[in-house]
């Protein structure tokens, strides 16, 4: 895929980006107005200058395990969109399909909730340990994931990334604010991704292992992970039903 070639060039030449030549696209501003505006804001004129580009994560193919009605394993808790793992996208989402998924499953969930909504009850008292990460770990977490668990993965890079994440997880926050919750969510998602990527010893869709470049039939499975209230992770495999 294109992003692998870009990443390979960046690694070989030790550069943070490659150059995109869009100067031959006469109607660039009309076809890509958002990108054009962003380039101008950063002092780049796409009509006359090369654009620096690099791969970036913008979608998670996994998510909270749900059924075809968006119901999670927690009673009366539903999830849809990028939050959920419906299986609709397979191993790699096609552009714009996330909008269709959100519309379909969002409608299903809304209809079910509307039919079964009960009386409002008092909130449940929190009686479990709460993990809150220090917002300061956000940047090193993102760097570790991009370098070791991003476009190109291997047992070595993933193991090193997991070690970094475990160290970062020791930096916790005692202040329950938005930044703490956001980084906590990023941290737990990163852990789930790295652990699953280590288990999946093959390449499939957007998951590419340089040490296991082939796609294997025995890996037509979902990897389901669970984090218990004591912070312990467990994984199991579910064969995809045809």
Residue ranges and their predicted role:
Residues 5-9, 15, 59, 65-79, ...:
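Glycine- and aromatic-enriched mobile tails/lids
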Residues 1-51, 103, 112-118:
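An anion/pyrophosphate-binding glycine-rich loop and adjacent beta-alpha core
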Residues 34-78:
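FAD/FMN-dependent oxidoreductases across multiple families
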């Amino acid at each position: 895929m294109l992003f692998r070639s870009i990443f390979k060039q960046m690694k070989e030449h030790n550069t943070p980006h490659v150059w995109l030549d869009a100067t031959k696209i006469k109607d660039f501003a009309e076809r890509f107005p958002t990108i054009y505006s962003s380039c101008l804001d950063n002092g780049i004129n796409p009509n006359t200058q090369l654009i620096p580009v690099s791969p970036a994560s913008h979608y998670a193919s996994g998510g909270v395990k749900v059924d075809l009605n968006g119901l999670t394993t927690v009673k009366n808790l539903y999830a849809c969109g990028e939050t959920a793992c419906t299986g609709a996208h397979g191993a790699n989402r096609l552009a714009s399909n996330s909008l269709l998924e959100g519309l379909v499953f969002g409608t299903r969930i809304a209809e079910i909730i509307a039919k079964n909504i009960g009386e409002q009850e008092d909130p449940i008292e929190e009686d479990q340990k709460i993990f809150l990460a220090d917002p300061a770990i956000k940047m090193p977490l993102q760097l570790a994931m991009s370098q070791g668990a991003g476009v190109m993965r291997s047992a070595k890079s993933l193991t090193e990334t997991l070690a970094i994440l475990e160290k970062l997880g020791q930096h916790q926050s005692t202040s329950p604010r938005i930044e703490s919750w956001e980084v906590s969510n990023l941290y737990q998602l990163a852990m789930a991704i790295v652990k699953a990527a280590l288990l999946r010893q093959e390449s499939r869709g957007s998951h590419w292992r340089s040490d296991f470049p082939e796609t294997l039939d025995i890996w037509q499975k979902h990897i389901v992970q669970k984090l218990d209230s004591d912070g312990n992770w467990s994984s199991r495999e579910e064969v995809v039903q045809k």
